Design a protein with these regions (language model features):
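Active-site mouth loops of central-metabolism enzymes
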Residues: 28-43, 74-75, 97-109, 144-146, ...
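Alpha-helix-loop-beta-strand connector modules within alpha/beta enzyme cores
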Residues: 70-98, 120, 140-170
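Hydrophobic residues within beta-strands of alpha/beta enzymes
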Residues: 48, 56-57, 117, 125
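Glycine-rich, proline-tolerant flexible connector loops at the mouths of alpha/beta enzymes
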Residues: 56-80, 100-107, 126-149
Length: 184
């Protein structure tokens, strides 16, 4: 197929996304360690796929850099992020893991994040426990974490919002960086 060819009946199907998610789960359960391609737009996803990658990763910082030419200060909205993912998945069959940052807010926002990103076609997403955006006046270089209860609540909300059981939802923590080895 040419560079601009899009099979609309196949490329946009939710069945296709489920197959990509199942492939991601098979990779997780396999014995082989695979490195994902760092992808950030439709062209990079297509190039990664053309050279043999089956797995892609989209970091929140990379998305902010490439979409807005902005630093990773949570100025990229969920809508911006989901639209970028949707454009990538429209032209690629990669199983895509995305960094969903802190879920774009509280547990209700996390539910919408899951809905939007799942609909966009991601195979897996991570949600972190770092309090974002960065609170004004916090000590320089000192990240803050959500409470354990809030983090667990957000992850439970994420799982409850998931429509496709093949979608992987992962929690990610900065506890070692923030708290050190004594508390973790």
């Amino acid at each position: 197929a040419g560079l601009f060819y899009i099979d609309r009946e196949n490329r946009m199907s939710h069945l296709r996304h489920t197959e990509q998610r199942k492939r991601f789960r098979a990779i997780l359960n396999g014995a082989e360690c695979l490195s994902p391609a760092s992808v950030y737009d439709p062209l990079s996803a297509r190039v990664a796929e053309s050279v043999g990658y089956k797995l892609g990763i989209l970091a929140g910082s990379v998305s902010s850099n490439t979409t807005l030419a902005a630093p990773d200060l949570i100025v990229l909205t969920l809508t911006d992020f989901a639209d970028q993912v949707r454009r990538m998945m429209r032209v690629s069959d990669l199983s895509l893991l995305v960094d969903a940052d802190h879920g774009y807010g509280n547990a209700l926002n996390v539910m919408r994040t899951i809905e939007e990103l799942e609909h966009a076609g991601v195979s897996a997403m991570s949600i972190e426990d770092t309090s974002l955006p960065i609170r004004y006046g916090r000590p320089e270089g000192k990240d803050e974490l959500f409470s354990g209860g809030e983090t667990v609540g957000k992850l439970k909300a994420a799982v409850a919002a998931r429509r496709d059981p093949a979608t992987v939802i992962a929690g990610r923590t900065a506890a070692l960086k923030v708290e050190g080895t004594e508390k973790t």
